[in-house]
């Protein structure tokens, strides 16, 4: 067994990452967003209320409008935070109105509200009124299917499946992501599948290999793409050097 692995590793040491997938930055730190906007690897941005709170955002509208003046020409998603569908619609229309003609603003709508009530009727209505949506917090194939059916024939839409959080439950998200991709492709060319809640750099490779349209990841995860195909012996040496440096800085003795 180990001989077969050694033979394989000698001839297949490269990552299968092809760079075809669109990589979005997931976060709400203004500095990181502006810095990453000039990075050709980054093709879009996603935010949510939790990330904004973590980043210390106090004025939702002011933050979003300022970001839009600094990040132009790349898709960016802002999420509604209302829980009642009437108010959710009002917020969605307001957010969509921040688009100045670049067609880069996407409104994030959760698949259900906090009461577990389906957002599908609102999703269908908004999409067919021309609002570009990022339907978020999807975990099941049924949710993906219903969403794709709702936005079919509507405005451009992103379907965000939280693959990382699915894996946190002990389930392999890849089969569901593959089935979801087939549905999105067959339903409408305006629908893109997004791999959300990236847990490790390898997820970027997984999503790319399977043909997923988009993956969103935090800045620290995206920076690891630069390490793809690094010589593993170099990684070993760097690791041991770090151990040595930290033990010296800590002043350890035996």
Where would I find each of the regions flagged by the language model?
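N-terminal amphipathic/basic-hydrophobic helices that include classical n-h-c signal peptides
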Residues: 1-9
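Metal-centered catalytic cores of metalloenzymes
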Residues: 11-14, 40
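Short beta-strand/loop segments at the ligand-binding rim of alpha/beta enzyme cores
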Residues: 16-24, 102-106, 128-134, 186-195
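Active-site beta->alpha loop and helix N-cap motifs at the rims of alpha/beta catalytic domains
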Residues: 18-34, 38-42, 46-125
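Glycine-centered loop/turn motif at secondary-structure junctions
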Residues: 40-41, 56, 99, 103, ...
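Catalytic alpha/beta core domains of metabolic enzymes, predominantly
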Residues: 117, 124, 132-223, 229-242
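Active-site loops and adjacent core secondary-structure elements that bind or stabilize anionic groups
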Residues: 247
